[in-house]
Amino acid sequence: MEPHDSSHVDSEFRYTLFPIVYSIIFVLGVIANGYVLWVFARLYPSKKFNEIKIFMVNLTMADMLFLITLPLWIVYYQNGGNWIFPKFLCNLAGCLFFINTYCSVAFLGVITYNRFQAVTRPIKTAQANTRKRGISLSLVIWVAIVGAASYFFILDSTNTVPNSAGSGNITRCFEHYEKGSVPVLIIHIFIVFSFFLVFLIILFCNLV
């Protein structure tokens, strides 16, 4: 078999695999995250939320933002990689994926640091106004990441390619990238910096 034939098989295989995997993730994710939000809403009045609970609720909300886009991707791959929805939904799906990824990383980082503070400085942590700090830090995280993700709304997210399985053309979503774009370079630098910053925080808190 020729090399290009192998890549074609791999490409076709994802149209079967991804809808199945995404469907499982969607069902389990909605149930699990919905249950977490229900528990917090029922058992903990909002005024009694401490810092760690605030971070956990925000982490759950970030996951839910990603989950609501999965039906779009399921339909996309079921249609052989053809985006049948309006273009702005492709931009929105990419934006929410970015937000989920980096909000999750950020909130896992601050949760780790919160536990580090609780273990190393229990008295000072207990006396601090952690609820106010948790709300403020959560707002900073959301504003920073949503601001960076807003770039996805101005991207040319879709492109038209010939349909390899038949006649006509199909529309791809985020499957082509412009080269030499300064904004793309900036966003990639932000991604790498953010990841390693949080990674170092988590590593430090677990090793010290």
Swiss-Prot record:
Membrane topology classification: Multi-pass membrane protein
GO molecular function: G protein-coupled purinergic nucleotide receptor activity; platelet activating factor receptor activity
Primary subcellular site in the record, as a coarse category: membrane
Cell compartments where the protein resides: Cell membrane
Glycosylation sites: 169
Keyword NAD: no
Superkingdom, taxonomy of origin: Eukaryota
Residue ranges, Cytoplasmic side: 39-54, 114-133, 206-208
InterPro entries: GPCR_Rhodpsn, GPCR_Rhodpsn_7TM, PAF_rcpt
One example of a Gene Ontology biological process annotation: chemotaxis
Function: Receptor for platelet activating factor, a chemotactic phospholipid mediator that possesses potent inflammatory, smooth-muscle contractile and hypotensive activity. Seems to mediate its action via a G protein that activates a phosphatidylinositol-calcium second messenger system.
Name used for this protein in its record: Platelet-activating factor receptor
Lineage: Eukaryota, Metazoa, Chordata, Craniata, Vertebrata
